[in-house]
Design a protein with these regions (language model features):
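Active-site machinery of serine-nucleophile hydrolases
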Residues: 81, 87-150
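Gly/Ser-rich "nucleophile elbow"/oxyanion-hole loop immediately N-terminal to the catalytic nucleophile
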Residues: 76, 133-172, 182-187
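Bacterial N-terminal signal peptides
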Residues: 8-18
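A domain-start/cap signature at the N-terminus of enzymes
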Residues: 24-81, 243-244, 381-382, 390-392
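Loop/turn elements at helix/coil->beta-strand transitions in domains of secreted/extracellular proteins
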Residues: 76-81, 111-116, 161-165, 184-190, ...
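Primarily recognizes the serine-hydrolase "nucleophile elbow" in alpha/beta-hydrolase
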Residues: 162-218
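Alpha/beta-hydrolase-fold serine-hydrolase catalytic core, especially in secreted/extracellular enzymes
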Residues: 27-30, 248-254, 260-413
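The feature captures the conserved acid-bearing segment of alpha/beta-hydrolase catalytic domains
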Residues: 197-284
Length: 413
């Protein structure tokens, strides 16, 4: 009898030993932030959350963080998400407070029909977005893991549209938006950076520069990127290398500049470069193909690195537009065109024709193997092209006008 009792006790102990770690793992994997407060902000519902750190993030010490979820003015199922990274001079609360006044860090102001997620990196020392000070190199750092996990949690918790998640930031937050956003094209549809404080973060995260992308690293097609920086802002130094890298990689970049300093007031910036809000970055969807325009004939000369006192404003790819028509297993089709003067109020001279290379990104259904041949047509023009080592197809030297013209790409049988 005693032997039976000892065996039964041993079984119980063994079960508990297995259950405890399993329970701990389940709790860690679940990671449920605590809703600390419900309130109202500018006529919109506001939820305040607090949470600890997941072990997988890799923080050296335990820490607590806060994030805010701002609801749209009208409840909406499957709404898009606007994600905001604050500057070095703000924290999550003061960042949101800027949205009470037009002209105060306008990039922080979430559209009324969007949910918005405001994240914090001020509470814990060395946890800043740009990562280059503490987490150098291409590896995914703890802050980035926290941001991405929080975004995914909010999308799921609130039932949002995972294909319409947009990342933006000002200054240090702009640097973080580039550095975190470009590496996560599987999360963010598009990124917009207002006077990003440096491009070192994004350059290291994306292997821009002399070091090639390692063979064991796969980079998802990145978000469409909008960047507006000033040549008379010391934080913009190095942009020539960033712009070149984006062009060489055939990534989508809409770039604007002018002597507006380290500004955050759109009204003042628009007086210097009235194109900075001309591209509808919030219309990009993660589950739709897009064209990356490179080597465009209409690009302005860069002020970086040695014409920083130049008073001229300029742009890269500012006038290109597209409309998706078809994305099927046998072909992908989209209309390419230039913005018309009737649709774009600007002091810039709007070109009537441009020549550019066009690379198709985020193609959903047409599968092209690396090195495989495809046939293409663009109006009366036609030809063949081969996919690069990542399976990306580029058609070089297309002449694009204000008249929408269909680019069609098919696999070669």
């Amino acid at each position: 009898m005693n032997s039976l009792r000892r065996i039964a006790l041993l079984i119980v102990v063994m079960n508990l030993a297995g259950v405890a770690p399993a329970t701990a793992r389940a709790q860690e994997e679940k990671w449920a932030p605590e809703k600390a407060k419900e309130s109202e902000f500018n006529g919109r519902k506001l939820d305040t959350y607090r949470h600890g750190a997941r072990k997988e993030w890799g923080y050296a010490e335990p820490q607590r963080d806060t994030f805010l979820v701002l609801h749209p003015k009208q409840p909406k199922a499957g709404a898009p998400l606007y994600v905001v990274l604050h500057s070095a001079g703000h924290d999550v609360h003061s960042c949101l407070a800027c949205a009470t006044k037009v002209g105060n860090h306008d990039i922080y102001h979430a559209p009324p029909d969007f949910y918005a997620l405001y994240l914090d990196c001020r509470a814990n020392k060395g946890d800043w977005w740009w990562g280059s000070e503490k987490y150098k190199g291409p590896q995914v750092g703890p802050t980035e893991k926290r941001v991405v996990d929080t975004v995914k949690w909010v999308v799921k918790e609130y039932g949002l549209d995972e294909n319409r998640v947009y990342l933006c930031g000002n200054s240090m937050g702009g640097s973080g938006a580039l550095g975190i956003g470009l590496r996560h094209g599987d999360v963010f549809a598009a990124v917009k950076a207002n006077v990003p404080a440096g491009v070192e973060h994004v350059s290291s995260r994306m292997y821009f520069g002399a070091k090639p992308v390692p063979a064991d690293v796969t980079l998802a097609d990145p978000p469409v990127v909008v960047d507006y920086s000033a040549q008379n802002d010391s934080w913009s130094r190095g942009h020539e290398t960033f712009i070149k890298a984006m062009n060489d990689r055939r990534y989508a970049l809409f770039m604007y500049w002018g002597p507006f300093g380290h500004a955050n007031n759109h009204e003042q910036i628009l007086k210097v470069n009235d194109l900075v809000n001309s591209f509808d970055w919030l219309g990009v969807k993660k589950n739709e193909a897009y064209p990356a325009f490179t080597n465009a004939s209409t690009n302005d000369p860069l002020p970086w690195p040695d014409r920083l006192t130049d008073k001229k404003s300029g742009q890269v790819n500012a006038f290109f537009r597209w409309k998706n028509l078809r994305d099927a297993a046998d072909a992908v089709e989209m209309k390419l065109f230039l913005a018309r003067a009737a649709d774009l109020k600007t002091s810039f001279t709007i070109p009537t024709e441009a020549t550019a290379d066009v690379s198709l990104r985020r193609v959903q259904k047409l599968k092209v193997a690396p090195g495989a041949a495809v046939s293409w047509t663009f109006g009366a023009a036609k030809g063949e092209a081969r996919a690069d080592a990542q399976g990306c197809v580029t058609i070089t030297g297309l002449k694009i006008t204000a008249e929408p013209t269909t680019l069609s790409i098919r696999t070669t049988k």
